[in-house]
Amino acid sequence: MAVSEQPTGIDELLERVREGLDRVEPPEAFEAAADGALLVDIRYAALRDRDGLIPGALVVERNELEWRLDPLGSHRAPEATGHDLRVVVVCDEGYASSLAAASLRQLGLHRATDLVGGFQAWRAQGLPVRVPETAE
């Protein structure tokens, strides 16, 4: 991604980034995970502790995402099996995840995308959530 000479606001940046993503709604993400897609939860710990986790999702905080998902990287997670891996990035409300998915695409993960509405939309759809023990 080239650096623009003109200042770009976050709304414009998000719009531009999302043009290159095939974003998925929560039910589609649930089905994709059942078919082998990797859901990656990039929310920070306080949000995960407060709201819970998506069962089976890989937790990688945003500041480590590229290092953990780069199939060629020395710090990659075992789940980072190759550039053809279908990755669905999940943040809290579906904003940061768009930027994160675009970054993964720049690393060659050409099937990376994000979850529309993030974790909050997933939970609102009644999809599985594992509530942390501390929140019970």
For each predicted feature, which ranges?
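Rhodanese-like catalytic fold shared by cysteine-dependent sulfurtransferases
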Residues: 1-38, 45-86, 93-136
